[in-house]
């Protein structure tokens, strides 16, 4: 089992799929990382040699991933809330940000229904 960016990658999966278990690396970026590192994306993680794992680590290290990315996103949201702009207010109230309707729907963002008290 390879460990990259503080994440244990599943040994039985292909490299490009396993890299996606790192927060901040999706389908496109994982394929790009494999290509630049010179690793076949369809190789199973358990079959990787130590130099290949090191090349992947070096390539993933060029991106902001995992805890740093989560922190950066949190700081950006906090900044919006401190500014008091529309998006910040929507974050503060737990409502959708991008113009979706809220009279019906938006249950994921609003949470479970609250009964109306008479």
UniProtKB/Swiss-Prot annotation:
Keywords: Ribonucleoprotein, Ribosomal protein, RNA-binding, rRNA-binding, tRNA-binding. GO terms for cellular component: cytosol; small ribosomal subunit. Pfam families: Ribosomal_S13. PROSITE patterns: RIBOSOMAL_S13_1 (PS00646), RIBOSOMAL_S13_2 (PS50159). One of its GO terms (biological process) is translation. InterPro entries: Rbsml_uS13_C, Ribosomal_uS13, Ribosomal_uS13-like_H2TH, Ribosomal_uS13_bac-type, Ribosomal_uS13_CS. Signal peptide: none annotated. The keyword Flavoprotein does not apply. Residues 96-118 are annotated as: Disordered. GO terms for molecular function: rRNA binding; structural constituent of ribosome; tRNA binding. Belongs to the universal ribosomal protein uS13 family. Located at the top of the head of the 30S subunit, it contacts several helices of the 16S rRNA. In the 70S ribosome it contacts the 23S rRNA (bridge B1a) and protein L5 of the 50S subunit (bridge B1b), connecting the 2 subunits; these bridges are implicated in subunit movement. Contacts the tRNAs in the A and P-sites. PANTHER family: 30S RIBOSOMAL PROTEIN S13/40S RIBOSOMAL PROTEIN S18, SMALL RIBOSOMAL SUBUNIT PROTEIN US13M. Part of the 30S ribosomal subunit. Forms a loose heterodimer with protein S19. Forms two bridges to the 50S subunit in the 70S ribosome. This is Small ribosomal subunit protein uS13. It comes from Stenotrophomonas maltophilia (strain K279a).
